[in-house]
């Protein structure tokens, strides 16, 4: 684990002034407990200058889109900010930071070693729809490591009304990654690790504060990964560097992040599509490869992200956000096997399909407060704009056959040299209006919001297509006691409108109105003693495009629907004096409705498990030794309109960390074993008739030096 997360772990500055009476009472109780044991941390632990709940895994303050930093216990949404400590403890060499996000019960991470992909409440998301420092669509599609990330905030459910306008869909929720900034204590950390197979990693994390009152900060995080992974014939080469410069003034804050990443995977991907089978073949050996070793794909990303806030007076703050993200599939060359028989036969088609995009985002607005009588108002007025140019093109290059249970070999083919042409240009302009009204000494809060945007889409060789829509946000919360808050909310999201393509449709070339997703949620947040629990009920209705027959022919329309209904329980805290816990569970009932001719109405959405959950634990044996464990469960799921069933699966990760010194240099040694049982299993992909193969058992060892 990174030593920098422990540098300020017991620094108790600046908490008392902000405490509620209940928190002050907790603090007095904690002080007595600390007198009895050095392991019992204060109610809000400061890790790297950031306050967390007991156990240090979840941060109390969440950066929630345009709302800014808010106490997560007061927000009328399901919001979780995973801390740097949790990210460093539970990220994996195979899936990076995505595996940490599965500590949030609404999130399920895929096992892909190459692609940022998760589901939130049953809806797929990739890097195109994720945020960095509040900038929409800025995350890479490639699987980046955690080294540069300070925290990750997950807002479950559609929430376009409180986030920056995003061209990519954020149906199930939003994920925002915050880059590391220089903290109060300077650090120089060097990390050396063995990631399994023949893969090794070297990293450095350096931060300094300087200038009058340490107002300026600089942080550089860089790493290199190279070597064959735990899967045979698959190799990963990765180079990343992120530079973060910030200024903290008396009336302004500025943050500038610059980033570069290049990731090359050799050996193809991990996914399988499913053909017309009557029985799902048993999962094969996950340590083997089922794609040609000469397949490869390369991701290259560059970022410039600027955030600035200026306090105009005691009640009004102006903000500006800017982002530039250039992304390239550097000669993308990939194939996905398709299962064609019950005996494990498959076909594979490899495509040479390079693509890339350039995204530019600009947002500005005012955030402030005022009072009308006894009612306090906190408002947001914001405007933003997205520009995207996408380049794409290529074609089918090679096809072959194989089997899951025998050794496969495919002769290599020459690679073409091809530059993808411009595919389309898109612009999206949006506005945000939010007013949070506080009554009864802030115990009762009402949030009203309205978001609208207009999209302009121009495909090469076609005329421009425009679409627009608005969506409201309503939320009501009541604090029954200082420790118990209940809320109800309604939120929405919508896409930019779908272009109808295909010669068989009578409305070919038409851009359909934006398809809306609507969520109703009821929840309660309870902070009692050493634990925080969040319970929530939700229903999400998503419009789908389906084929509709009319007297004059076939049309593609937004007349279909998917309905996801569920329950979540999330928790974080401590048991006794040494055991930190974080995790939760979700029940999800995802059904198809309003399908074509009603053929699949009431059937389960492919790949969605009814039950899933994760528990992460750290047991502090003594001040030097800690034991680490995580157990994940994914329930049975149906695919192919309930004609095939994917069995339930368990995954267990175990490890230990040891803090010591080499001379005067603090060193943290971490040993982890992932998928301890070594079980091979299929992982269903929510909303699709496809599968991921589990990651094989692997061992990693890391040493972090605090120089």
Language-model features: where?
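Acidic, small-polar-rich N-terminal luminal/periplasmic segments of exported/outer-membrane proteins
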Residues: 40-185, 522
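Face-selective signature of the C-terminal outer-membrane beta-barrel domain
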Residues: 304-327, 348-461, 535
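Gram-negative outer-membrane beta-barrel transporters
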Residues: 539, 558-641, 677-680, 704-706
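Transmembrane beta-barrel wall of Gram-negative outer-membrane proteins
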Residues: 187-189, 194-268, 294-311, 362
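Membrane-embedded beta-barrel scaffold of Gram-negative outer-membrane proteins
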Residues: 307-323, 327-333, 486, 513-594, ...
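Structural signature of Gram-negative outer-membrane beta-barrels, strongest in the C-terminal barrel
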Residues: 357, 376-388, 422-542, 572-574, ...
């Amino acid at each position: 684990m990174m030593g920098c997360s422990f540098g300020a772990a017991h620094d108790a500055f600046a908490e008392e002034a902000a405490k509620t009476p209940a928190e002050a009472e907790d603090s007095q109780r904690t002080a007595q407990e600390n007198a009895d044991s050095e392991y019992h941390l204060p109610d809000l632990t400061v890790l790297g200058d950031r306050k967390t709940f007991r156990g240090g895994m979840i941060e109390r303050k969440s950066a929630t889109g345009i709302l800014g930093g808010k106490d997560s216990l007061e927000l009328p949404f399901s919001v979780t900010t995973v801390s740097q400590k949790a990210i460093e403890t539970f990220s994996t060499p195979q899936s990076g930071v995505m595996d940490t996000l599965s500590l949030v019960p609404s999130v399920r991470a895929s096992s892909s070693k190459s692609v940022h992909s998760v589901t939130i409440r049953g809806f797929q998301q990739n890097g195109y729809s994720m945020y960095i420092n509040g900038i929409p669509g800025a995350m890479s599609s490639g699987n980046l490591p955690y080294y540069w990330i300070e925290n990750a905030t997950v807002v479950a459910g559609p929430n376009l009304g409180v986030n920056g306008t995003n061209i990519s869909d954020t149906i199930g929720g939003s994920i925002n990654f915050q880059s590391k900034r220089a903290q109060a204590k300077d650090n120089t950390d060097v990390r050396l690790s063995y990631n399994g197979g023949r893969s090794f990693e070297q990293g450095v994390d350096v931060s300094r504060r300087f200038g009058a009152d340490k107002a300026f900060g600089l942080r550089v995080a860089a790493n290199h990964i190279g070597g064959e992974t735990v899967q045979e014939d698959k190799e990963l080469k990765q180079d990343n560097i992120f530079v973060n410069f910030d200024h903290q003034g008396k009336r302004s804050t500025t943050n500038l992040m610059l980033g570069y990443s290049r990731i090359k995977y050799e050996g193809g991907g991990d996914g399988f599509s499913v053909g017309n089978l009557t029985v799902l073949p048993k999962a094969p050996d996950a340590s083997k490869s089922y794609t040609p070793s000469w397949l490869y794909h390369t991701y290259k990303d560059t970022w410039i992200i600027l955030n600035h806030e200026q306090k105009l007076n005691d009640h009004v703050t102006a903000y500006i956000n800017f982002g530039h993200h250039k992304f390239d599939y550097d000669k993308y060359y990939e194939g996905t096997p398709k299962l064609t028989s019950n005996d494990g036969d498959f076909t594979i088609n490899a495509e040479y399909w390079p693509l890339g995009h350039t995204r530019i985002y600009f947002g500005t607005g005012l955030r402030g407060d005022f009072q009308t009588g006894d009612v306090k108002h906190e408002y947001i007025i914001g405007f933003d704009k997205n520009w995207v140019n996408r380049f794409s093109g290529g074609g089918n290059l090679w096809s072959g056959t194989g089997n899951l249970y025998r050794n496969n070999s495919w002769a290599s083919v020459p690679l073409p040299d091809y530059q993808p042409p411009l595919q389309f240009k898109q612009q999206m302009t949006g506005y945000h209006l939010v007013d949070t009204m506080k009554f009864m000494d802030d115990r009762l809060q009402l949030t009203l919001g309205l978001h609208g945007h207009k999209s302009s889409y121009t495909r090469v060789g076609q005329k421009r297509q425009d679409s627009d829509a608005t969506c409201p946000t309503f939320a009501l919360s009541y604090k029954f006691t200082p420790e118990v808050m209940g809320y109800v909310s309604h939120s929405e999201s919508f896409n930019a409108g779908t272009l109808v393509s295909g010669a068989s449709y009578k409305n070919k070339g038409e851009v359909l109105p934006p398809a809306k997703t609507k969520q109703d949620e009821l929840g309660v947040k309870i902070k009692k003693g050493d634990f925080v629990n969040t319970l929530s009920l939700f229903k999400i209705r998503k419009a789908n495009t389906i084929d509709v027959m009319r007297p004059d022919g076939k049309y593609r329309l937004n007349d279909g629907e998917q309905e996801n209904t569920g329950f979540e329980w999330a928790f974080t805290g401590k048991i006794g004096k040494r055991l930190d816990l974080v995790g939760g569970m979700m029940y999800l009932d995802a059904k198809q409705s309003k399908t074509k001719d009603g053929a699949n109405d009431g059937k389960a959405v492919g790949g969605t498990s009814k039950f899933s959950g994760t528990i992460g634990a750290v047991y502090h044996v003594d001040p030097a030794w800690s034991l680490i464990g995580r157990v994940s469960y994914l329930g049975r799921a149906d695919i192919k309109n309930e004609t095939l069933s994917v069995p339930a699966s368990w995954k267990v990760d175990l490890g230990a960390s040891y803090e010591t010194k080499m001379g005067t240099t603090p060193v943290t040694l971490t040993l982890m074993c992932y998928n301890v049982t070594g079980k091979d299993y299929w992982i269903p992909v929510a909303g699709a008739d496809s599968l991921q193969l589990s990651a094989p058992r692997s061992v990693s060892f890391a040493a972090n030096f605090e120089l």
